[in-house]
């Protein structure tokens, strides 16, 4: 059974690298 905390941790693990890559892309684009 998957708990809410496991879902939240999974989302964080998935989103953090994407956000960092997005910010890095913006900084390189400027």
Swiss-Prot record:
TM segments?
A: 7-27
Q: Which Pfam families does its entry note?
A: PsaM (PF07465)
What domain of life does the native source organism fall in?
Eukaryota
Sorted keywords for this record are:
Chloroplast, Membrane, Photosynthesis, Photosystem I, Plastid, Thylakoid, Transmembrane, Transmembrane helix
Q: Name one GO cellular component term.
A: chloroplast thylakoid membrane
Major location category of this protein: plastid
Q: Which SUPFAM superfamilies match?
A: Subunit XII of photosystem I reaction centre, PsaM
GO BP annotations, alphabetical order? photosynthesis
Q: According to its UniProt record, where is this protein located?
A: Plastid, Chloroplast thylakoid membrane
Its membrane topology, per UniProt? Answer: Single-pass membrane protein
Q: Which InterPro entries match?
A: PSI_PsaM, PSI_PsaM_sf
Q: Can you tell me which family this protein belongs to?
A: Belongs to the PsaM family.
Q: What name does UniProt use for this protein?
A: Photosystem I reaction center subunit XII
Q: What is the lineage of its organism?
A: Eukaryota, Rhodophyta, Bangiophyceae, Cyanidiales, Cyanidiaceae
